[in-house]
Amino acid sequence: MSEQNWKQNLNLPQRDTRPQTEDVLNTKGKSFEDFNLKRELLMGIFEAGFEKPSPIQEESIPMALAGRDVLARAKNGTGKTASFIIPSLQQIKPKLNKIQALILVPTRELALQTSQVVRTLGKHLGIQCMVTTGGTSLKDDILRLNDPVHVLVGTPGRVLDLAARSVADLSECPLFVMDEADKMLSREFKGIIEQILEFFPKNRQSLLFSATFPLAVKSFMDKHLNKPYEINLMDELTLRGITQYYAFVEEKQKLHCLNTLFSKLQINQSIIFCNSTNRVELLAKKITELGYSCYYSHAKMPQQARNKVFHEFRQGKVRNLVCSDLLTRGIDIQAVNVVINFDFPKTAETYLHRIGRSGRFGHLGLAINLMSWNDRYSLYKIEQELGTEIKPIPATIDRKLYVADNEDAIPKPFKIEQLPKGNEKVHTRAGYEYKGQPEVQSGQQHAQQQLQPSQQPQQQLQQPQQPQAAPQGYPPAFNGYPPYQQYPPQAGGYPPPQFNGYQAAPGQQ
């Protein structure tokens, strides 16, 4: 392919023309060609829909390509994943059949997503990427490592297991990458990370990326990194494109409040967070009973079920996903424009990662927090720590705050080509039998189903949700509060914030 026309033959996706915020537009004007990348890598980058580097990519990619250790801090949804995948792919030698990059992430869903980004960007390089996580077949992973693997993406426990068995040879691996480094160096994972590093050569290169860097990261940096280049693009913690509201609601009125939000908001896709796995399952069932499409996911589900839910939600087969904090880390689904905290989080870190599931890559998003009176202390604390303002929910929410005029331009996520096979053992609390949750299949039939195109294109989700008739006796009466008809009808479904509870949705008064 000649020097002049190689770009003309690229299979480019539909251009994302939605407006973006300064979180990704405040760049120095560099292009990906300025980094002297391999042409095959540039082809993968452009065919994935990347047009120009974001600020974190401008800062980190040149330093990583120069061989420096990098400690980078940037907001959720600003392009951190490509910031370490692009230099990793540039440095890999496809003819050398050894693991040349290890990418560690805290959750299994994020491992699946990251591995697919590696495959998508590196599809013209002849690079083999393997994903390995807990909850999947160890035997299959061992067999897979008999074949060439250049990039290994996984969760810490499984990677340590494979390294300790001398199945995954990291002795000549030159590149160590940690995404969501603050979580990876928490008490939960830090000991495992220290053990994994013992299998690496001493002259390795380390790349650490996160939105927050607590003291644990500082101590790890002093011990294991070699004069790292530090990047901090966190002039403020929250994304500029996300509008945040709260509503004080009694616990028994939360479901009715959620129902009203569904009927009033123009939701493309939403993620609804709860603080416990039990509440995740119960809420998902209630939402399904109200007639809305809904899946759920939490850590106690079988891995195969989690993979299936994650894959179908990414592909736009369902509009709403109820989950625990399992999906607060790194999950990138551009179509999500609304995040609802059904249970208000206790820490600023959790809040920051939850709302960061909307407003991805400088686009618009909406975060709504349903709060009990006891949550007011957490609200004040989070506002102070993040330096942000969470406003009372207004009578009407301007759709321009969270809905782009050209929603058809939303890019489809990188399709996960094949999901790992789950363990044979099935958790007794699987919780995916009820109507609305996808059935989980196994073997070749399951793998083939993942390769079929979505039966419900993502664009179909852009119509407002239409609730079915509510169950008899729903919503419950407001104890001690004026009847619904005493609220002014012009409130448009959103009562003033001083009211505990929402006025009934149309047809339910």
Swiss-Prot record:
It holds the Pfam family DEAD. A motif (DEAD box) lies at residues 179-182. One of its GO terms (biological process) is deadenylation-dependent decapping of nuclear-transcribed mRNA. ATP binds at A74, K75, N76, G77, T78, G79, K80, T81. SMART domains: DEXDc, HELICc. Residues 441-493 have a biased composition (Low complexity). Residues 241-401 form the Helicase C-terminal domain. Belongs to the DEAD box helicase family. DDX6/DHH1 subfamily. This is ATP-dependent RNA helicase DHH1. It comes from Scheffersomyces stipitis (strain ATCC 58785 / CBS 6054 / NBRC 10063 / NRRL Y-11545).
